[in-house]
C-alpha cells in the first residue's frame, strides 16, 4: 500500500468515525493552494471542525500525531483562514485524527 492509498483509507476511516460520533461531514480534501489542504471539514453541533488526518501503517516510525510539524500546522491554519474568509462561521476549532492500521486498528481524536 503506497502513502496515497494509506492516506485515502485513513480519511475514509476518519469520516466514518466522525459520523458515528455525531459529526456531519461538509467537505473533504478542500484545496486552497498547492500547500494548503484541509482533509475534512465537519460540523459538530454549532461548531465547524477542521480535521487533519494522519495515518500510519504501523507505529514503527512514530505515532501519527508526530507527523504534524509546525509548517504543516501553519498550512492548516492558513486553510482555515481561507475558509473563514469565504464562509460565515461563528464557532470553529481544529482537530486531529490519528490512525494506526496495524497491528490492530487504532483511531485517536484530539
PLM ranges: what are they?
Residues 28-32, 97-100:
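Short, solvent-exposed loop/turn elements at beta->coil junctions and helix N-caps
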Residues 110:
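Hydrophobic residues at beta-strand termini and immediately following loops
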Residues 33-36, 103:
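Short acidic/glycine-enriched loop/turn segments that link adjacent beta-strands
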Residues 38-59, 76:
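Conserved catalytic cores of phosphodiester-cleaving nucleases, focusing on short active-site segments
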Residues 1-28:
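Acidic-basic catalytic patches of nuclease active cores, encompassing PD-(D/E)XK
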Residues 12, 55-103:
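Catalytic cores of nucleic-acid endonucleases
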